[in-house]
Amino acid sequence: MKILVGNDDGIFAPGVRALANTLAPDHEVTVVCPDRERSATGHGLTIHQPIRAEQVQSMFVDQVTAWACSGTPADCIKLALGALLDSPPDFVLSGINQGPNLGTDVLYSGTVSAAMEGVIEGITSIAFSYSSFTDQQFQPAANFGQQLLEHLIQHPLSEPMLLNVNVPAVPADQIQGVALTRQGIRRYHDLFEKRIDPRGKTYYWLAGEVMEDLEDDRMADPFVLTDVQAIRQRCIAITPLQYNLTANNSLNPLLAWLTPLQKRQSVI
């Protein structure tokens, strides 16, 4: 199979190296990643300056073709699909990210956005994240990525979609299983640290603490874990995501809410 791999941690990150090298013996793997750290850039694109891409060597096994791109994670996948590859890949993978992408993290995540770019182009995609910001034992996550990819090949999905995969930061023999999950709630208590540079000008660092599982019990589905809950239980979490953000459950209530305004507008 032809596999395109991106990330947001950059071309030098050990997570993408583990994933690409693990897949390379059985697949045609092309890596296109940012040339530097691009975490939390969301689905941003570069439109006001050129994008540059250079092939890199020595960081991956010989079977892997790798490019370092000056753009965002989404730029990397878009550029690969539109210019660098001679034909579309069978799958787009992203990661393995250093740190989890749970709940509302996916709205900010360059890792998830890179994979979502594949889905926008009609290609089944997977985003992989390892739930530690410090531990770099990526091989169990890479091994699971290989297993999941083989399962997708043998049992194709009915339509292209994004699978957001979070792997708990525990030894492989302590992983408690694989759970199909829904997106949880993972917000942050933001804190901006105010500092003064040597020239007397003010600047800020974004910091803060994670607030997890703030879901209203009345809205909870007791039969499907959230991704946050699954990781707490040492399970691999697989969450299907889509780019259509329409709040479908709100459409009918909003029709009644909007009717008075529509009537008023009709007489203007």
From Swiss-Prot:
Cofactor note: Binds 1 divalent metal cation per subunit.
Gene that encodes it: surE
Binding site for a divalent metal cation: D8, D9, S39, N97
Subcellular compartments: Cytoplasm
Catalysed reaction equations from the record: a ribonucleoside 5'-phosphate + H2O = a ribonucleoside + phosphate
EC identifiers of the protein: 3.1.3.5
A molecular-function term among this protein's GO annotations: metal ion binding
Keyword field: Cytoplasm, Hydrolase, Metal-binding, Nucleotide-binding
Pfam families per record: SurE
InterPro entries per record: SurE, SurE-like_Pase/nucleotidase, SurE-like_sf
GO cellular component: cytoplasm
Record flagged with keyword Cytoplasm: yes
Protein's name in the database: 5'-nucleotidase SurE
Cofactor: a divalent metal cation
Protein purpose: Nucleotidase that shows phosphatase activity on nucleoside 5'-monophosphates.
Family statement drawn from the similarity comment of this UniProt entry: Belongs to the SurE nucleotidase family.
